[in-house]
Amino acid sequence: MPLPTSQLRLAMVAGEPSGDLLGASLLGGLRERLPESAQYYGIGGQRMIAQGFDSHWQMDKLTVRGYVEALGQIPEILRIRGELKRQLLAERPDAFIGVDAPDFNFNVEQAARDAGIPSIHFVCPSIWAWRGGRIKKIAKSVDHMLCLFPFEPAILDKAGVASTYVGHPLADEIPLEPDTHGARIALGLPADGPVIAVLPGSRRSEIALIGPTFFAAMALMQQREPGVRFVMPAATPALRALLQPLVDAHPKLALTITDGRSQVAMTAADAILVKSGTVTLEAALLKKPMVISYKVPWLTGQIMRRQGYLPYVGLPNILAGRFVVPELLQHFATPEALADATLTQLRDDANRRTLTEIFTEMHLSLRQNTAAKAAEAVVRVLEQRKGRA
């Protein structure tokens, strides 16, 4: 059924930079499929705004870093959410799309759905890894979920939640064969000799907890692997300043710190030591052997352990359904253990070939033209609503 010729209005909310990137990608796909007169508004960042999005509030008002900071921001976040819900109920857009940020968006989505406004959520929370009870909230709040990973629709289907697998945008963005030589030239690194990328995280708390351990591991690796060089991306000047005392404490390290360009840094590497997170998927798509690690405060770790379901935390292992790369977490993440595991990943050529095969298959599975698939799913929801009207 064709969509109405009257002006379409879609409300959207992205709460952090990664959501802004996904939202902009979705908007690009929607603009190719919906009438030019369609309007898009809500909360988004600069990438969404560049796609013609009208952001009524600043996205960084929703971006929280750490529990202490979050407590201070709660009143402002609740105020914005209340105003947004009142606006939605008054203006009744054709659909509401929440981009990630589930703690903020599910509440808005439930209000929209209860009012007869279709609610769509982009990025399924990791209910398959921990806090599985959130599936009940999803079932109450979401009409249609756009999933990044292929195993998620089956989980949602059991709870009666309609969904579409749209693939992961990183798989569309990253080439199937990484240009390691070109990345080394771009960073001024030698063409020959081993290079290890080290990524200790992007938050102050992450650097404080695992940064010293990663630097101690680098010092051990340099002793055991003569000629090895390290590259470490710093996403912001503030992060670089946070790393500087650790750099000063290890003046003999053959370390290059880059301003951002984390993907280039990983592409240049032969192996990667990385803090758990989405960046581990990026490393897999770049076909790199890696060691995954993290350290969190003891109480946080206990909560995560009790609410978790899988024996692994890294996305490459989760997607493979087994351990394909080592994980050293919490008290197991000692400098000695990290150095041993990373050097093994660096030196084992047979393992490198096996991982390349595994990660290539993973890459092809996730490469779905996410912007187009997500936009097509949204259009179908709009058509279904029109059919019921």
UniProtKB/Swiss-Prot annotation:
Gene Ontology BP term (one): lipid A biosynthetic process
Q: Which GO terms describe its cellular component?
A: membrane
Q: What class of enzyme is it?
A: transferase
InterPro entries, alphabetized: Glyco_trans_19
Is Nucleotide-binding among the key words of this record? no
Its UniProt entry gives the catalysed reaction(s) as:
a lipid X + a UDP-2-N,3-O-bis[(3R)-3-hydroxyacyl]-alpha-D-glucosamine = a lipid A disaccharide + UDP + H(+)
- What GO MF terms are annotated? lipid-A-disaccharide synthase activity; phospholipid binding
Q: List the transmembrane segments.
A: none
Signal sequence interval, chain numbering: none
Database matches in Pfam families: LpxB
Name the pathway: Bacterial outer membrane biogenesis; LPS lipid A biosynthesis
Key words of the record: Glycosyltransferase, Lipid A biosynthesis, Lipid biosynthesis, Lipid metabolism, Transferase
What EC number(s) does its UniProt record assign?
2.4.1.182
Q: What does this protein do?
A: Condensation of UDP-2,3-diacylglucosamine and 2,3-diacylglucosamine-1-phosphate to form lipid A disaccharide, a precursor of lipid A, a phosphorylated glycolipid that anchors the lipopolysaccharide to the outer membrane of the cell.
Q: Which family does the entry's similarity section mention? A: Belongs to the LpxB family.
PANTHER family recorded: LIPID-A-DISACCHARIDE SYNTHASE, LIPID-A-DISACCHARIDE SYNTHASE, MITOCHONDRIAL-RELATED
Instruction: Please identify the protein, giving its name as recorded.
Output: Lipid-A-disaccharide synthase
Higher taxonomy? Bacteria, Pseudomonadati, Pseudomonadota, Betaproteobacteria, Burkholderiales
